[in-house]
UniProtKB/Swiss-Prot annotation:
GO terms for cellular component: chloroplast inner membrane. It is found in: Plastid, Chloroplast inner membrane. It comes from Hordeum vulgare. Its main location: plastid. The gene is cemA. Contributes to K(+)/H(+) antiport activity by supporting proton efflux to control proton extrusion and homeostasis in chloroplasts in a light-dependent manner to modulate photosynthesis. Prevents excessive induction of non-photochemical quenching (NPQ) under continuous-light conditions. Indirectly promotes efficient inorganic carbon uptake into chloroplasts. Belongs to the CemA family. This is Potassium/proton antiporter CemA. Keywords: Antiport, Chloroplast, Hydrogen ion transport, Ion transport, Membrane, Plastid, Plastid inner membrane, Potassium, Potassium transport, Transmembrane, Transmembrane helix, Transport. It catalyses: K(+)(in) + H(+)(out) = K(+)(out) + H(+)(in). It is a multi-pass membrane protein.
Length: 230
């Protein structure tokens, strides 16, 4: 009876896993036009912020210096420069457009991900019964295994998430999250996350093995330590 109930629960879990991709692609198309209109209206109504003005000014000075250097190299520099060359003006306009596009994509990705998380949370809440059935079936399946296979699976999971090569995997995960939300990469945050999160997770797993698993099956803990120390 439990196995019959577990199949719909398993299908529901697959639906929840695939849901974010479907929602993301659908809402990206729906929200893109609306956010573009909102962003362009906002940009026309509110002038540039102090940060944007500072960045544009820095970019303008950089381009002007490069242009003057180029003129000096060519020997065409005049003693008095009345106005910046038209090339700089075009470069600044192009840079502002690219900057606006970047901001637009950040808002679009962030909005889509927030909607995905809200729908995903609602799906977990509404499908609580199916997930409880699936959880009980997985626990029953796990407890019916012999201690050696249990220890093997526990060791496989722990090594996969907190093993020697897991740091590279966690780095890819945090980079993927940043790219998915449209945020600019931050190497400092990546380093802190990779150095701290696996350690915290490893501590939690050790706590579970020593205090929780030891009460359920002491022989399993002995086998687990024998395999891990081999």
């Amino acid at each position: 009876m439990k196995k019959k109930k577990a199949l719909p629960s398993l299908l529901y879990l697959v639906f929840i896993v695939l849901l974010p991709w479907g929602v993301s692609s659908s809402f990206n198309k729906c929200l893109e036009l609306w956010i573009k209109n909102w962003w362009n209206t906002r940009q026309s109504e509110t002038l540039l912020t102090d940060i944007q003005e500072k960045r544009i000014l820095e970019r303008f000075i950089e381009l002007e210096e490069l242009s003057l250097l180029d003129e000096m190299i060519k020997g065409k520099l005049k003693t008095h420069v009345q106005k910046p060359p038209t090339g700089i003006h075009k470069e600044i306009i192009q840079w502002v457009k690219i900057n606006n596009e970047d901001h637009l994509h950040i808002i679009l990705h962030f909005s889509t991900n927030i909607i995905c998380l809200a729908i995903l949370s609602g799906s977990f809440f509404l499908g609580k019964e199916e997930l409880v059935i699936l959880n009980s079936w997985v626990q029953e399946f796990f407890y019916n295994l012999n201690d050696s296979i249990k220890a093997f699976f526990i060791l496989l999971v722990t090594d996969f998430f907190v093993g020697f090569h897991s740091t590279r995997g966690w780095e890819l995960v945090i980079r993927w999250v940043y790219n998915d939300f449209g945020w600019a990469p931050n190497e400092l945050i990546f380093t802190i996350f990779v150095c701290s999160f696996p350690v915290i997770l490893d501590t939690c797993l050790k706590f579970w093995v020593f205090f929780c698993l030891n009460r359920l099956s002491p022989s399993l803990v002995v086998i687990y330590h024998s395999i891990s120390e081999a």
